[in-house]
């Protein structure tokens, strides 16, 4: 679940929470995955792998490659914790808004 207006790591940094269903109860899987900085809008797009072990998170407001260049981060679940897999996938230039849409393959 993406909450791109969350303020956990700064105003509008955003975050993502993943939930799993056990019986009739939804429980959070792992920790909150917070955006990097204010106005990243992380969680504006989210894609979960078919087995639930990877999540791609778009942050279209990230400034890693220029103002509003955006980026995507991929996280893997190990035990009950999410950790980043590889480096940030940054947009190419300012105002690219990379990460507006993300999608993982089924494998």
Question: What annotation goes with each model-predicted range?
Answer:
Residues 1-107:
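Conserved beta-strand/short-helix segments
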């Amino acid at each position: 679940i993406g909450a791109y207006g969350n303020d956990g790591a700064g105003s509008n940094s955003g975050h993502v929470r993943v939930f799993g269903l056990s019986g009739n109860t939804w429980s959070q899987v792992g920790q909150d995955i917070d955006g990097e900085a204010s106005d990243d809008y992380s969680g504006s797009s989210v894609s979960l792998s078919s087995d639930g072990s990877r999540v791609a998170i778009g942050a279209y407001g990230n400034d890693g490659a220029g103002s509003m260049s955006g980026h995507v981060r991929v996280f893997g679940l190990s035990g009950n914790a999410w950790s980043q897999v590889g480096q940030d996938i940054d947009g190419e230039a300012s105002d690219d808004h990379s990460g507006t849409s993300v999608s993982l393959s089924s494998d």
